[in-house]
Design a protein with these regions (language model features):
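Short glycine/serine/threonine-rich phosphate/pyrophosphate-binding segments
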Residues: 1, 73-79, 140, 144-147
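Active-site-proximal region of nucleotide-activated glycan assembly enzymes
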Residues: 1-43, 49-54
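Short, structured coil segments at secondary-structure junctions
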Residues: 2-3, 18-21, 90, 113-115, ...
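Short, glycine/polar-rich helix-capping loops at beta-to-alpha or helix-loop-helix junctions
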Residues: 9-19, 105, 144-145, 165-172
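Short glycine-/small-residue-rich Rossmann-like dinucleotide-binding loops
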Residues: 11, 69, 99, 140-142, ...
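Hydrophobic residues at beta-strand termini and immediately following loops
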Residues: 25-26, 120, 158
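Donor-nucleotide binding loops and adjacent catalytic segments primarily
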Residues: 39-136, 169-173, 177
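A donor-sugar binding/catalytic signature common to diverse glycosyltransferases
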Residues: 126-168
Length: 178
C-alpha cells in the first residue's frame, strides 16, 4: 500500500525532497486553547500568571521565557541561571519551566538571583507564558516552533543535538528563514 498524498507540517528544508508523488504542506496543528490565546496582550498574560502563581511579575519589564520542551533541558537549567545572574538585576524578569524532576537543581542554580523569577517544573498555561514573553530560549521541536510562530515571539532556539535525523535543527532553520 502507498499513500496517495503525504501531508507535512513544514516544507522540506536543506533542498530536501519527498519521494511521495504528491505532498501537501498542511502546517503544524496547534492546541485549540493556544490558538484562542494567541492574541493575548503582554499585560493580560502577566496578570494571568500573577493570578495563577502569585508571581509578582511586572508587565513593564522585559521578560525571558526559558523551557526545554516537555522533558526540560538540563543544559538550560545549568547555563541560563549563571548567564542571567551576570546581567543587571531589575532590568528584566525570567519565566523558567525546568522540566519534570529538575526543579530543585534549577532552583539551586538561581539561588542568588536578584531579578523577578517564576520557576516551575512545567505548566499547562503555555498561552500565558508565551504571551508574557519578549524573548524565548527553547528547543526547536515541531510544536514549539509552531507555537512560537503563532505567538510571533523572538526566540533563541537550541536544537536537541540527538533528535532523529537532525529534525530540530531543520525546524529552527525553517523558522529562521521564514
Amino acid at each position: 500500500r502507498q499513500a496517495k498524498v503525504l501531508a507535512t507540517a513544514f516544507p522540506p528544508v536543506n533542498g530536501g525532497t519527498s519521494k511521495a508523488k504528491r505532498t501537501v504542506v498542511t502546517g503544524m496543528p496547534v492546541r485549540p486553547e493556544l490558538e484562542a490565546e494567541a492574541g493575548i496582550s503582554k499585560e493580560e498574560a502577566v496578570a494571568g500568571l500573577n493570578r495563577a502563581f502569585d508571581a509578582g511579575l511586572k508587565p513593564d519589564l522585559p521578560t525571558v521565557l526559558i523551557f526545554g520542551g516537555s522533558q526540560g533541558a538540563s543544559v538550560f537549567n545549568r547555563i541560563a541561571p549563571e548567564a542571567l545572574r551576570s546581567l543587571d538585576a531589575g532590568r528584566f524578569q525570567v519565566l523558567h519551566l525546568a522540566g519534570p524532576d529538575k526543579l530543585e537543581e534549577t532552583r539551586e542554580a538561581y539561588r542568588d538571583a536578584k531579578f523577578p523569577l517564576l520557576l516551575l517544573p512545567a505548566s499547562e498555561k503555555m498561552g500565558l507564558f508565551l504571551g508574557a514573553a519578549d524573548l524565548v530560549l527553547s528547543r526547536s521541536g515541531g510544536s514549539t516552533v509552531a507555537e512560537l510562530a503563532l505567538f510571533g515571539k523572538a526566540a533563541v532556539l537550541i536544537p536537541y543535538p540527538y533528535a532523529a535525523e537532525g529534525h530540530q535543527a531543520d525546524n529552527a532553520r525553517y523558522l529562521a528563514d521564514a
